[in-house]
Amino acid sequence: VVPVTYFNTRYGKTINSGKPFNFNYFVLALDQSNKGYFINTNANEVTTVNISQLNTPDVWQMAAKLPTDVGVEFHKYQGRVMLSYPKQFKLPVYSYLVNQRDPKTYVSALLGTLNQLSVTQEGSKTVYTNKLNNQKITYDPSWETVTFEDKNPKNKLPQQYVNRLNLAFSQINLLQLNLMDTRFYESQAGGQKITFRTYVKGFPVYFQSQSGAIHIELSKNGDQKSTYSLNEIGVPVPSNQADVQLPSTETILKQLHDAGVKSSDYDFITPG
């Protein structure tokens, strides 16, 4: 979930809700009632707001052109609310060139210049270490990732969830990279595990690595570990592939059950 204060800062808005809240979905009513709903599926809470800047013909003309053949609904599952697709649906195939960032970009941004570091090999992996501050970066060509570890004994785990998010965002901002297509995806363990993914046409991309575009872990003793995929979406290219038909959420859940996968093994399901 994301604090509404981040929404206010990102979009320059002020949500007058009476008290701070967190959310992970925003739903806009398309019946021109000018109602919006911030949904927190973790806490089963909905905050209703009035939208004051959408009452223009252009907005509703655009809304009328949105696809209506992909229905979604919220339902309770495993003690929490989950977004589900009640019917099978089709998604188009999008094709993009994939660029790969130079791992040394991360080394320079997070550790400093190479002449300050020791460089060693661990099999196929390259390890850059700054012994002065207990930080290192491991480049893994097999997974096409770099992993930054900060074990400075002065580090402390922030006590509040919002401050853990602040720490993660500050870490990402050090890179000074173009992350326009990268979005917050999920947090677990009270913000000690935070994942960001690249999004295309509103859907997350899963190919980048085992843990998304960016995955940050904060340990109880303050150690920080962040893994970055070197792969990034480039320019779009034409695709002649047919649309892919995806099953309903209920069908997916049944297939997982039949395959022996326990419901406790996953938190939610989303297409991408």
Summary of predicted features, one role per range:
Residues V1-Q160:
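Preferential activation on post-signal-peptide N-terminal prodomains/segments
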Residues L167-Y206, N231-G272:
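Segments that shape or occlude catalytic/ligand-binding pockets
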Residues S52-Q53, W143, S209, S239-D243:
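Surface-exposed beta-strand edges and their flanking turn/coil or helix-capping segments
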